[in-house]
């Protein structure tokens, strides 16, 4: 059985077995949309970037609906948020490729529409936070196809949310490969080391070399045990970084980790929670 389909983007004959793709897409594309504020949290590995991103997502969800994107292949954001890990973007990509090769999806069906539908199915939905995980790269040294899907997801999905918060992989690979179009706020997280500040400065320089537009770049120094040493303060000034928050070492994080609890259960007096509140206030998010 074949069905004639005619939309603004596609006109043609498909098999009846493929009709559910279009029914799903019509509902998806028919929603009224509004632009989201896009925030990227970046930093070298081991500085507590995901912890900052998780608390930022949780606190912003009290103000609006948040799309949380885990762009780190290690996919730890779901644990920090206390959410299950659903199908990843990379897995969805593999399923679509296999379905096309086996003829389950007709080559005449717009691939972008099918991608959009699969990305939506990969969303882990909760009350005020939806999570999309990037997952593993396509193969050794290649992240291109999955990155393209992530960009597609951001472009289409973000319009349905008040905030889009991206937990970037170390080095901001998705930005350097133009996965993210424009960013309203880039929060670079560093620890209290010269190496961390230098990495933050390199990220800031990388942004200036790319076509990606970034509205504001801000530095957050995490896990401070006793303020900032003069050497760190001098390095921040030397590299022209804008420091907006210094977050003390948080003893509650280790306690939650030992009990297998998510970071969003940090108490109100948690240094990390208070520090992220300061970030939101200073950036007027």
PLM regions: where:
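Short hydrophobic targeting helices and cationic amphipathic motifs
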Residues: 1, 11, 22-25
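Conserved catalytic-core segment of NTP-binding enzymes
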Residues: 62, 145-249, 255
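Walker A/P-loop phosphate-binding motif and the immediately C-terminal alpha-helix
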Residues: 37-73
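N-terminal phosphate/diphosphate-binding loop that engages ATP/GTP or pyrophosphate donors
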Residues: 61-125
């Amino acid at each position: 059985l074949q069905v004639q389909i005619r939309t603004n983007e596609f006109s043609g004959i498909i098999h009846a077995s493929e009709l559910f793709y279009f029914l799903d897409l019509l509902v998806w594309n028919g929603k009224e949309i509004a632009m989201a504020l896009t925030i990227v949290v970046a930093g070298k590995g081991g500085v507590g970037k995901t912890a900052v991103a998780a608390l930022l997502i949780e606190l912003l969800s009290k103000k609006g609906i948040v799309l949380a994107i885990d762009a780190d292949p290690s996919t730890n954001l779901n644990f920090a948020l206390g959410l299950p890990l659903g199908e990843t973007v990379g897995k969805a990509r593999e399923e679509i490729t296999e379905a096309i090769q086996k003829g389950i999806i007709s080559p005449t069906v717009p691939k972008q529409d099918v991608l959009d539908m699969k990305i939506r199915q990969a969303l882990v939905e909760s009350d005020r936070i939806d999570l999309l995980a990037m997952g593993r790269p396509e193969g050794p040294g290649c992240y291109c196809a999955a990155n393209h899907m992530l960009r597609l997801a951001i472009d289409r999905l973000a319009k349905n949310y008040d905030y889009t918060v991206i937990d970037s992989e170390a080095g901001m690979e998705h930005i350097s490969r133009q996965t993210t179009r424009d960013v309203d706020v880039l929060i670079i997280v560093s620890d209290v080391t010269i190496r961390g500040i230098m990495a933050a400065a390199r990220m800031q320089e990388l942004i200036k070399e790319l076509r990606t537009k970034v509205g504001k770049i801000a530095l957050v120094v995490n896990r401070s045990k006793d303020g900032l040493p003069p050497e760190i303060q001098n390095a921040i000034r030397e590299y022209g970084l804008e420091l907006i928050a210094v977050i003390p070492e948080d003893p509650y994080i280790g306690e939650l980790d030992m009990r297998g609890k998510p970071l969003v259960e940090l108490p109100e007096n948690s240094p990390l929670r208070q520090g992220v509140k300061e970030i939101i206030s200073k950036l007027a998010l």
